[in-house]
Every structure is written in C-alpha cells, then in structure tokens.
Amino acid sequence: MLYWLFSIEIMNINHVDIFYMESKEKTTPKEFSLSVIHILHNCSPHLKKGLRDEFYKLNGRCEIYRNKVELREENPLQGFYGSRINVEAIVGVNGSGKSSLFEIIYRVINNLSCLLNRGKRRKTADDLYYVKDLYSELYYVVNGQLARISCLGNKVEFQMGNEASVTLTAVKDGMVSSEKVLMADFVKWAKENFFYTIVTNYSLQAFNANDYKRERCLILKDGLDDAMAETQAEGHAWMDSLFHKNDGYMTPIVLNPYRDEGVFDLNKEHHLTLYRLSAILIYAQKHYRRFMEDYDLNDILYTFDASSLKKKYVEKYQVKFIVYDGYKCSPLEHNDIGTEILKCYGVMDGLIFDDTLQRTAAMYLIYKTFAIANSYPAYEEFSSLGELDKFTQEVVPETMDLICRLVKTIMRDKSHISLKIRQTLHFLNALKKGTIDSQTFLTSKISHREYFLCVNEGKDLRSMRDIQEYLPPSFFQIEILMNRFENGERVNDTPIPIEQMSAGERQYLYTFSTYIYHVLNLLSIQESHRVRYRNINLILDEVEICFHPEFQRRFVNELLGYIKRLFMNRNASFNILIATHSPFILSDIPQSNILYLEDGKMVMPEGIKNPFAANICDILYQSFFLKQGFVGEFARK
C-alpha cells in the first residue's frame, strides 16, 4: 500500500502531518466524474440564487441515502464513451438554475485554490479572492473512490474515501490564518486526487464582473484581520482572477473566453484561435482527417511582424525605443544580461544583429527568458534576475551563474512554458545555417509547408508535440486558408480565409481549439516537482450558441473523437459536463447522466423517456419541459 502525507505549514515553522491517503489497487479502473453538488442551508442567498438547500445528482455513480452521499460499487457506464471519459448534462428552462449550479462549482474550486495557493509565488497572476458565506459541497469520483470538498464559511474540508478529512482554514480567531500547504504535497495531491476545470461560456451575459462584486470576499494576506481582509477585497470580483493561466496551470480552473470587466475582445480571441488552430489543422491534414466536417486545410501563411515584440519592450516594460532599437551584443569582456542570455542558449556564434530576422529572434529570446523567470512558480528561484528593462545592465558573477542555471532549466523544460523559446531557437538555427532566406521571409508570405522544410531538419512531423515544436515564433502573423467540400467535391475556386467562415463555424473552431489547447498544455507538464493534473473537467455552458442543429447533433461525438485521436485519454481522465437546451446534444447522453432542473430543484426522471438515441420531439417535450407543445406561441393562439 502507498501512503503519503498531506502537510500544513504553520507560520512557515512547523509541519503538521494531519492526513494520509491509501491508494486503490492497481487494477482499479481509471475514472473521473463530478457526481453530486450539495447546497447547505446556511449558504448566502446571493450565492445560491434560485437554488435550494438540497443535493443535486449529476450521474448515477452515487446515491443519496439518509442525507448522505454513497458511492455505488459498480460504474454501469464504465467505458461507455471510451476509456477514462464520462459525459453528463444539466437541462432545464432559462432561470432553472443551470448556470447558478455551475457558479457554485467555480466558487468551491476557487476557495480551495485560495488555500492551496496561499504562500505560493504567482507574480504575474491575479490575486485570488476567497468567497465568504459559501456553504456548499462538491462530491466527485476518482478511480473508484468518492472525494468530498466542503466549503464551510471560513474553512474548507477535503476527504478522500473513508480516510480522515483535512481542514484548511481561511480565518481563525478573527485573523487570516497563516496555514500553508507545502508545495510538494500540493503537487502530489493535485495529480492523484484533484482535477483541473476548463470552462467555456460565450454568452454575452456571462461572467460579468459587476454581477459578482456584491459577493463578500477576502484577500488572504498574513497579518490581516477578518474585517481588513474583506475591506482590501472590496471592488474586486473573485471570478476575474480565474481567466489567467500565468501561474503555470497551478490554480485548478480557467474560464474562457478571457473577459475584462465582463467584456471579451473578439479580435484577441480570434488571434488566439489562429495560433491554437495552426497545429491542430496541420495535424488533421497529416493524418488525412478533417478537423471540421466539410472543410479541409488549404494552407497556413506566415508574415513577419516584429511590432508586437517592440510594444512589449517599449510600452509594457518602458524600455526607451532608442535602447531597444540600437541594442547590440556587448563586448566579450563586459557582457550585459541580454548578451549573457544569448551566450547560454549557444546562439552567439555567427549571430548577425544587422540581420533583421536574426536580431528579432535574439531580442525575443531575451524577452521570453525574462518573462519565464518572472511569471511561473516553477521558476521562482530565478526571479531575482529582475524585469526586462534590466537587460542592458552589466553582468556580475552572481547574475552570470543565475542566468546559466535559468537557461539550462528552460532547455530541459519540455512543457508549454518553454515552447516559444524552442520554436525561436529552431528558427534562429535555420537562419544561421542558411536554410531560411531572410529576404524572402521579410517580404513574402511563407506557407507552413515551406516553413517546415526550412526548419525541421528532415524530421517527419506527425505528432501534435512535434508540429507545435516547429511552428514559427510569435513574431509572425498567421493567416489560415480553408477549402470547402460538398458531397466530396471542392466547391470554392479560391481558398477561403477563416475570417470569411460563418459565425457558427468559427464558434465551432473557437470552442474545440480552446479545449484542445489547454488540455495539451496540461499534459505537457511532466516534471515531478510541478503541479500536474491528470483528471480534467470540461464544463460547457450553453455550448450550442451559434450552432446549427447539425453541429449540435455531431458535437459530443466530435469532442470525444478529438480526445481519442490525440490520445489525450491515455494519460488523463475526462469528465465533460454540459448545460444545454439542445435535444440533439441530449440524445447522446444516457438518462442516468442527466440532471433535470426546474425552479431551482432537481426533478426526478421517473416518467421521462431516456433521451439517449431517442426521438427529438420526445426529448423536447419531456426533457426540456415544453408544456405548451411544439408550435410557436403566436400560432398556437
């Protein structure tokens, strides 16, 4: 049997070992699912909204017996959707409580995250805010064991199976508690017993910060009393802190798309989608599959553009333009920090700063190295390097050693954190070898096929990891061109820019690319000392927005297909939770995995026909509570 300790550090002095877990036998099937949400009676009305003080059961993995959640011995749907995948849904009319129930999940995860991350370095990530007056429980199943997270006002309890529960405290005796979870325990616990949640909600009304600012919150800083911790949190919405990933996916939830005060930037979202889609579309083409039915990739064109890099130096980090524009490597005897970084990457020999492309690549390496050192908890020991505006300072011996160790650590890191560094190094090496013609790359659009021939050194790029590795660096703009097919025949005379696709088609691309991007990033984290989640919870709120019924009909099958084709479920377990008004989506989900809501209450499914593979009209009538039939109200009258 395997035992491990979950420790709490008290005021950074004492380690109190208060918890151990017993692993299941190796033969236990890998599984993960969210099973029950329980709203407790003293939960604030502002938080539960129209929900009731009751249990909400998401699937048939658990039973509620005498106000207690009990795990069934067998999972009747084990393997139903494929290895290590579970799909479940919440349905109900508008106002029935679907999104409110999701928000309870987000708050529970947020509060636990506040306590787990307390004392951890998250320099470029937003502060987390602990939600007060939350009394709710979240039950989930991991590999045959029932886990419980209970938010009980100023404390959070966690229990796995029949073992003793762990209590983490936000406020104790009127003061912000100084308890801190050790990083080593956090890492092990996250991998084995917790999950990462990726949320999408493209509704214009969703995630508006102003809707949450009335909720009482705390900022958990040592030395503050309860009142001061609440005062310092005033004006902040806890939800705003969950849009960022700049802590290396340590905080176990991310909301999409990114919103600033409730507003999301469509142009920025589109730009991110182009970057995420590039590797996915190339992968699909190489494996003779279509990422999207009726469309094939025609080409991806890259155009050199150094303006965004200049903005980072000059506008974000306040480097004077004359310093940025005139920078060249310093003499050998008196290196500056930028030069030392380039030396440690081994790119100085033959580097020509008068060559625009080489100079841009070198300046990007300097920028990105500073960014990694200052952004990610795994690189905390290198934060003393300082900010980017110090890159021209002379190197002292201590800094020289720090830079050398930093670069070596980045070079060993094969996760998403160092990906853009690796892409830039491949590009720079190709430039120096002469396989890239600078003039052509400066003045022309470059096809992705042509680019790969220049940089991949003859490798057959077929895996998603390899394709991502050899994509162009961030100082290239991306243009994706598609071909459209009907009955197997191409119908477009000229390639179709992705911007000319319909709103529904682009929404389809945005949604799928978001999930694939984040999951691949999570799975790229391999180092044992970093937080690695291997249970992944995908929440899709009103996923059918902009989708034609045919897209809705195919949605679940397509999502399952991507998970399997990219082998994501080989090393991770997935729970897919969908709030929907679509009978087509519901027809792919067995009744045991559906929570029916009406007026904030769970409706028992007795008398409701199982929607799996059922007639759409039957599903509309019974599962979506269409009490007035299927005819428009004006016509009915």
Predicted regions and their residues:
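Short, flexible/disordered secondary-structure transition segments
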Residues: 115-119, 266, 522-526, 566, ...
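Short secondary-structure boundary/capping segments
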Residues: 107-108, 118, 152-157, 239, ...
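Short alpha-helical segments and helix-capping/turn motifs at coil-helix boundaries
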Residues: 117, 124, 237-242, 580-581
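C-terminal alpha-helical "lid" subdomain
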Residues: 622, 626-637
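Beta-strand elements of modular eukaryotic interaction domains
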Residues: 78-81, 126-129, 243-245, 499
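Switch/communication elements of ASCE P-loop NTPase nucleotide-binding domains
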Residues: 13-15, 32-34, 39-110, 476-623
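Acidic, metal/cofactor-coordinating or nucleic-acid-engaging core segments within structured domains
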Residues: 204, 521, 554, 628-629
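Coupling/switch/interface segments within P-loop NTPase motor domains and analogous charged loops
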Residues: 3-31, 129-134, 139-145, 149-493, ...
